[in-house]
Amino acid sequence: MKVIQGDYRGEGLKIAVVVPRFNDLVTSKLLEGALDGLKRHGVSDENITVVRIPGSMEAIYTLKKLLDLNVHDAIIVLGAVIRGETYHFNVVANEIGKAVAQFNMTSDIPIVFGVLTTDTLEQALNRAGAKSGNKGFEAAMVAIEMANLRKRLRRDVFESDSNGR
């Protein structure tokens, strides 16, 4: 049996992080967590691209453009969508989630969903490092693992195909 999986070695990986300015109290902490995770695991500053955008909906356009560039090993999208009194929360949360899923099905570059969807600001802050760990850090770990998995899948599938299996 062959088991293929990624690891947490970030050396040489190029990672983009897309982060909105909206809800900056939360998203800045998510970004800090993501950058901490990437750097702790060997991703160098020169291989990290941070793209600041106005809000979470703008991530869809930005992700498409980053995918078109085809220079990153993985892309992290961060954000904080906090429920309010209108339907806007549902629209934003659903559309960004659907877009990330669609891009992951149709592109070769893994996109990691690090967008918080919470009922309250307190819940968002807790998930951005106050109590429940930092989801930005967790997204960085997933990005490194998936970037390495992508490389291994390419290598192992290519080697298998080359050997006639």
Swiss-Prot record:
Q: Which terms are listed as keywords in the entry?
A: Riboflavin biosynthesis, Transferase
Q: Which GO terms describe its cellular component?
A: cytosol; riboflavin synthase complex
> Listed GO molecular functions?
6,7-dimethyl-8-ribityllumazine synthase activity
Where do the coiled-coil regions begin and end?
Answer: none
Q: Which residues form the active site?
A: H88
Its recorded reaction(s) are: (2S)-2-hydroxy-3-oxobutyl phosphate + 5-amino-6-(D-ribitylamino)uracil = 6,7-dimethyl-8-(1-D-ribityl)lumazine + phosphate + 2 H2O + H(+)
Any Pfam family the entry gives:
DMRL_synthase
Listed GO biological process terms? riboflavin biosynthetic process
Specify the domain of life of the species encoding this protein: Bacteria
Give the metabolic or biological pathway: Cofactor biosynthesis; riboflavin biosynthesis; riboflavin from 2-hydroxy-3-oxobutyl phosphate and 5-amino-6-(D-ribitylamino)uracil: step 1/2
Keyword check for S-adenosyl-L-methionine: no
Q: Which Enzyme Commission number(s) are on file for it? A: 2.5.1.78
- Root EC class: transferase
Binding of 5-amino-6-(D-ribitylamino)uracil, residues: F22, S56, M57, E58, A80, V81, I82, F113
Record's function text: Catalyzes the formation of 6,7-dimethyl-8-ribityllumazine by condensation of 5-amino-6-(D-ribitylamino)uracil with 3,4-dihydroxy-2-butanone 4-phosphate. This is the penultimate step in the biosynthesis of riboflavin.
Please state which protein family the record places this protein in: Belongs to the DMRL synthase family.
Q: Which NCBIfam families match?
A: lumazine-synth
- Annotated HAMAP family: Lumazine_synth
| Name of the protein | 6,7-dimethyl-8-ribityllumazine synthase
The organism of origin for this protein: Thermotoga petrophila (strain ATCC BAA-488 / DSM 13995 / JCM 10881 / RKU-1)
